[in-house]
């Protein structure tokens, strides 16, 4: 299981000067090798990772060391492989129609290079609250204090250093192949063993961020309204400030970028908390598999109004929720599967038939055959689970669940 620890660096003025120069050179390496690979791609040629790395290696190895150049080039390879994977998924019809995969971007913000340092695991070591960097080419060696707790134990991997424009701070991200993790005040071996063998279905939504139905009939809802509030608050603030910029003839600014980043950070924090609480609860219920419904094509529905589009594209962060579900569930030995949620909101759990217009008011589902009324999101969660589990305990009271 791979995870990363993020620590805030506390460099002196002299150390920050070295970090800035080193990280700017790192950004140059990324941009140079990315340029060569983009040229090959747009000319219709196979992207030659080895050839392009060798070119950039010779250009920069004396400045920041051969190992550092290699690590940055190989991180760029990962971005390209992810892009090619998305292209394959697009060709196979596995992605929404509106989604168009794009090649890796350059490290630039408003014309300025975005700082990046990537080091191999033998180029750094940690002593107390001090990070020691070595093998840095003409920069040789650098020692920097850090603030934060390393809450993971295991084999250390690649280290990255970035600069956060929003907080105006330097951060290091250290990857681990994790064996133990601090939970509370105790070191716990991870991944854990599941406490049972049940499966749970999860329907993702707006007012209910997650509706959860377990095959034994247990169910609960996870509130999504605070996430909407975060989005509406920042939308108004950003729109007001953007209006002022427009009047002055300016399209963007560092402050505007910081506002967008703060909105993302707040939304991500809420999602992280909600997902962890959900997974912990499912672990206690004996769940070993989570089945999540993914609503293809809904995030860019042009027929919806601007208000609804904002919710779907900025608040309804399906990909972030699913990614965090996978990451947190892995710690508990729980497997996450993603299925197409098509027709899950229209099928009655009791009669088993699909009904158009059964969702007659917000959050309610009424079966025209049985006359029963359920929570619409829990109906979705039940039917999502049914795509993977054929025998499910139908608990009618569980389909009326309140937020837990």
Predicted feature locations:
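Gly/serine-rich nucleotide phosphate-binding loop at the start of the catalytic core
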Residues: 1-71
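Positively charged, helix-rich recognition surfaces that bind polyanionic ligands
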Residues: 3-4, 17, 168-404
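Generic detection of short hydrophobic beta-strand segments and adjacent strand-loop junctions
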Residues: 5-9, 139-150, 220-225
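Stable alpha-helical structural segments in soluble proteins, enriched in small hydrophobic residues
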Residues: 33, 71-83, 378-388, 392
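Short coil/turn segments at secondary-structure boundaries
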Residues: 35, 39, 45-46, 87-101, ...
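Surface-exposed helix-capping loop/turn segments at secondary-structure junctions
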Residues: 38-42, 84-92, 284-288, 331-336
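Acidic carboxylate diad motif detector
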Residues: 49-166, 315
